[in-house]
From Swiss-Prot:
PANTHER family, sorted: LARGE RIBOSOMAL SUBUNIT PROTEIN BL27M, RIBOSOMAL PROTEIN L27
Keyword set, alphabetical order: Ribonucleoprotein, Ribosomal protein
Protein name: Large ribosomal subunit protein bL27
Biological processes annotated in GO: translation
UniProt similarity note: Belongs to the bacterial ribosomal protein bL27 family.
Organism: Flavobacterium psychrophilum (strain ATCC 49511 / DSM 21280 / CIP 103535 / JIP02/86)
GO cellular component, one term: cytosolic large ribosomal subunit
InterPro entries named among the record's database cross-references: Ribosomal_bL27, Ribosomal_bL27_CS
Disulfide bonds: none
Length: 86
């Protein structure tokens, strides 16, 4: 019996768990207040009207409505929620 581990065994097993990032509610779909619209690292998408950004850069709907994505300028993407009529 070996008194030390095999050489390769301790060098394996570092695969990290996926973080499930990305768009959760797409443009034209309905969101209710508090729904997660985009989970991201950094501000790839910026908050527009009726959207706020959490401390981990996640975008949430502030009100119920339809999600709208739009580009402004070269590479600025904004996500907004168009509120439903009352």
């Amino acid at each position: 019996m070996a008194h030390k581990k095999g050489v390769g065994s301790s060098k394996n097993g570092r695969e990290s768990e996926s973080k499930r990032l990305g768009v959760k509610i797409f443009g034209g779909q309905a969101a209710i207040a508090g729904n997660i619209i985009v989970r991201q690292r950094g501000s790839k998408h910026n908050p527009g009207e009726n959207v706020y950004m959490g401390k981990d850069h996640t975008l949430h709907a502030r009100v119920a409505g339809l999600v709208k994505f739009q580009k402004k300028g070269e590479n600025k993407s904004y996500v907004s929620v168009v509120a439903f009529e009352a």
